[in-house]
């Protein structure tokens, strides 16, 4: 157990000691040592409080294996991996083990009794007894065999284990695990060839490992341990190492902090100041507060500042000692005695506080203790006075002589006598106080001098034994400290002449230790023949196994710190009692009862044999085992006690990356109570603060000089935990220098080479951001690291090192080059370190392509086709010279998730705002908010509180400060909390259990803390019992065990994950896995190599939910090449820390359960994945039916969003998507021309569903998202540059270039006009071949309004585009060029207006019965383009100027609609319309409740947030009642004027004279998916109310009656994110098509819907369109046209229905790929 509270105290006093382990920046270690018992306990009984918990042995073994794999993977030792399990301990340790096991057995028994008393039914299987983790038990024997199997398996199958020597010291090897490790380290150091720069990492949970590590005096030594959380709610331990946060404690920093702690001695001592000797004495002082071998000295507690007292005393006394106390493990007794004498002043000081309190108490009430003490010591006091009398008289006479008068002399004498009497009384009381301690604690009758001398000798002997144990190993197996308590410091005297000698003896055998440490409750862990010795009354040692025992806190606070008062085992009696039973041992038991050697294993490729499995049913045999081993004798590592070698640390040596030091930056240090927050709370004690000294010359701090010194260079940031970074910009708050280099370039400029740079002046906003950055960095350094950075003159912007990647030069050479993050982070200049010599051991033997891609090597394709496929390199000798590699790729079958993506809203958990829950539960929203969080109830009443203890009776479903939620119950959307039906049920149950609690808090909402007696004031009410009942209910409820997740985590709900698993299983049944052989350029392949860990395989890939991915990391928990689906994205403040939750296609060992089947989930970083879906998007140019989710940082840095941002799309709480950005002005004309060409002659199908609310998010969106939301980069232009760079890179390959792909996207299919056919290629205007995408984004074309149209423009304007040749419009991701109105667009607009007036080429024709039906709503073509590259959808030319009812914020139909005689579209249901109206006018969703009448009829009640309450008629079913009630509500709304339908504009082609200004969004944050999607027509409603956009027409949508009628498509068919694109499976006859279109358009009647009308007929199945089709208009923004407020509804002339017999039927199909030109 080590030293209680020591780890927390030391971490808070020295704040920079520890850092959270980040796998991508872990330092390199040569040796990794594991103290295994912590892992065994963690994996076998993670939650001792749960009496229902059961676990099987195979699960324990599997978890232990996985834990070892993860630790090995994190640290990646280069030379030695040492696993040490606790063997038989020295007798000194057994006493502590015995007490701990007795306590744990009793606690387990008590918990089981309480559970049974509560009526709980416990499992029939036996619970896991943690006491079985003791050498000699059957469990440990089985574990030993399985660990040997595991070592052999990993060495034989895992490349990363094959270059390392493995040591396995099991439970059969005597000694504690950590001390066996230290024996090995000492023996290695004693070798003549020992490398002093060996880098050690020791894993373990014990706090005394800090001391053990320091005894090695090694310069590069770190401790790895799980994060320890102090304070707050006790949470269940997590078994999975992936879920665990690991901390790395650096002893290199600990050494420097100790140096600072005792730096005052440098000026005081006369002998040499030696930090190694100071560290030895520091270790000795740590023993005085107690550890596993001796109790703490009385009243010396760490949490009562015992350690600062020890340090202060040491600093005061050391100058007088003439040398150090601890001489390499040998105690210098004379110096130690003088130190203890000085320290003993503490005893008197502590008692003086007690004495003063006792005297005061006696003066008030009389005190029996003082009277008895005075009486008992009267004789001793009298003798003491008599001895002092002559001296007292002499003093009195001398005082009298000095006084001028006799009276004064008498007064002085009286005062002196009083003081002497007080001193005598104090000493008497002090002796009596200590005497009472010894009599009561140690049970002695007479506290004699001999007793005290024996106490002192035993204690000093204990200190010396521990020093030997830490420095030299076990010096005596049989010695132990024979008391439960330590003596007073003032009684440890006369020790300088003690002769201390130890007999080595021999360790207990395993069964002897078991009988010595186990309680009778664990008797079954012993062989049967010994069990009666623990239970039988006739047993000669029965008194050593008391069923009940007492514990004594002895000044401690926690029960686990208490002294367990059980008798010490008499070794002789124990062995004699066992002797009579030994003959009954079985053969297997005899084998267990012996010691064995340590195992040394290594890989040998020439050795091959079959290693049989210790459990064939669970673990397979190792068919090709390549492990060799050697037995290491028990005393092989024993080093002579006089040859303990101390490593001398070379202060001028190279800096070893990952082993921090404070020496690189000048600073001052001092102790101060600064409240540094290392753990969850601010520290209460002193912190050793560091203050950076800025002594630079003014010229050095000029921004020009700083820029020339660091710009483009590699520096180290984040002092003292240095990380390498590349500087890309510097700024002093007014000026900014930055590197100007081609996109994608990350060059480090060495020497005096100056990078190409530019300088700009910061705007006011940028200056403000600069100041905020400094404030944030300063606060972080001060609050977490205890570092004061002082005034900042410059901020450095840099990219952190992410790893190294093999780069291939043109001549075929291979180099390992550093890779830098794309994310740019700010660092203050005075904390960066430059020009240091750093040791870099990362060398590579790979120099050529042959080395990098030898035959039979596994690779992954990063080009298209076959993106992400696994391949095997073939013999490529004939192609290497040409720079190509021959590879055979496996092409597996991939599941089709498109339909699931479209219908995901059906399976998502629905969340409601708090007021909805409040309305349903009949309570206020305040109560919902309070009870789902935390509520504290104190004891007593507000007027008379009883203590400070407060109980939390909240449900703890949300955590604002920690930004955490409980999935399935709560969801945070923006700043609003949403709640599921499960949370509603839980609250309802709570209200039923404690209605008076809810009632009281509702009346006293202004209070923060409530009190028991105020809530339950009745005489018969016991508030404490009520609170305890509530707490017991809360702890027993399943919700208390649910895990929290960050609000930044975007996830798919469990129901969707289940559907994904079903699709994957369907795909497996097809078993299609073809192979292709291709030749590939080497830079398009990724080979999994350890040197490339941390490097993202494809930096252009963007990850979205539902994306298909493949693991490309070797020696990982997930098998390399295993495919999966992204089901969650966890954002982080740093790019490298982003994690993806992946559901893999197969179960694998070590897999997690993340809302999925057991063993199929895992969390991986971007560097471990290749995104298969990204490859598909690149290959086809088609956007998948989902929105981009760019990982969100927890804290964004300097957002690059424009100030005029209006917000974007909002989604439901479970929706993982980011808002789109606001459209920008001036990028519409190119789109309109293109869409008019695409859409002319195209029938507009179906009213777009609300699911398709403009959430068209092509892959390039995330680039802007990155800058706007997450702060990963500054400007979207840079992203466009990067995209263009990636296009240029792909052009070089044999695969389809991205640029070509883009041009294909923008090229139309062949069209025909009349009988003649024309091929048209549409080019971007003013585009030169060399123009980069970034330049296109920012270029504004000159205004060319007055140029006359050219012939080609007239030709385009008059073209009739064939419907058969209509082209799809894929969502290309590049934003169009911003342009003013051009001649082309004017020509097109004029032509369109003329055609509309003359009704030429109207697309509003109707196909035959099998054709798709036209939507009522003709949404307008976008006059804007989304900044992120959202492409508008095609629209017929003649409908370009129709009224607009759709924009990006509201996706509803326009007033203008088309209906066909005799065939009316189905009605959108009243419930859907009411939900839509509420959303669009900013009202919360309606609340529906049902009432049952006596006639078993159902009445629905609709309640709106504006107070409107509507009752529907009586109906036979709930669904009918709900619809009728919603219809009534809609009629009420119409009469009240709640909805605001506005008429369409008259002159839609002309912009307003004064464009309206930008209006901010009504809701600043996304709201929730309040209502479930309608099951027949629509998905979720649009969550953002309509927002007017500058320069655009704007009006609210209509309610039923003015709403156009919807097409009858089955619910859930459409994607709620991207409209489906409809293409033809076969080409229809094109003859006379234009003439038919003209006839049908003239014959089509138009109807204007009146408000309140809802007449329509339902479509028959034959009339309904195919379920897979969709409108292509769903995401069109509003055109910028005038809408006059006084304008009425404009109707169109009726048209006759076309004859379906005149045209051929067409079949439409959904096609998600780019149309081929041949079509």
From Swiss-Prot:
Keyword Disulfide bond (UniProt): no
The EC number(s) this enzyme carries: 3.1.13.-
Biological-process GO terms, alphabetical: histone mRNA catabolic process; meiotic cell cycle; RNA processing; telomere maintenance
GO molecular function, one term: G-quadruplex DNA binding
Name this polypeptide is given: 5'-3' exoribonuclease 1
Positions of region (Disordered): 1268-1317, 1397-1445, 1634-1719
Tissue expression summary: Expressed in heart, brain (spinal cord, dorsal root and superior cervical ganglia, neurons of the cerebrum and brain stem), peripheral nerve fibers in the skin and intestine, spleen, lung, liver, skeletal muscle, kidney and testis.
Compartments it resides in: Cytoplasm
Pfam families: SH3_12, XRN1_D1, XRN1_D2_D3, XRN_M, XRN_N
Organism: Mus musculus (Mouse)
